[in-house]
Every structure is written in C-alpha cells, then in structure tokens.
C-alpha cells in the first residue's frame, strides 16, 4: 500500500490558500490509490474560489478505490471541499460513499 505524508501548513484565509491545501490533498489521494472518476463537474483547482459562507462547499471530486474488487465491490467517494466557519477561517471537507455514481457528481446505488 502506498503512503503519503501531508506536511504543508493548512491555511484557509484566501483563494490561494484554499487552492493550495485542496490541490495537495487531491494529489495525495491520487498518490495513495484513490484516482478521480470521469464524472463531469468536478472542482478545478486552478480556478476554485474559497467559499465566503460557513458550511459551504466550493466543489467536489468523485474518487474510487482502485483495487482488485473495483469491478465487483465498487466504492466511490464524493469529497466536497469548502469552508466550515468563515470567522475562524476553518476549512471543511465532507465525505460520502456509495457503490455507484451517475457520471455527473451524484452518488447512487448502495450508500455507506
């Protein structure tokens, strides 16, 4: 199993900060074997803006476990990136899991 160490400071005060931590986390997930699906509408880290409202996601990625069971026991993760608390500049990450996706960012099938 591949591992990855995340060592960047987790600042969340600007669009630049949001893009930096989001992209690094996104890249780390790819490195450890959670590739992005081909779903449309996924977050673009070059242009994403930090939400200015609490409990708001700026976008999402659909990822899946790329292992020997992918064909028979598929698990998709929807990872939403955003802001939990604007006054404290806190980043937010929401994760949902299911057995399928509709190809445009909605999880379907069995949910976990």
Predicted features and spans:
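Long, leucine/valine-rich, helix-dominated scaffolding and oligomerization segments
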Residues: 4-112
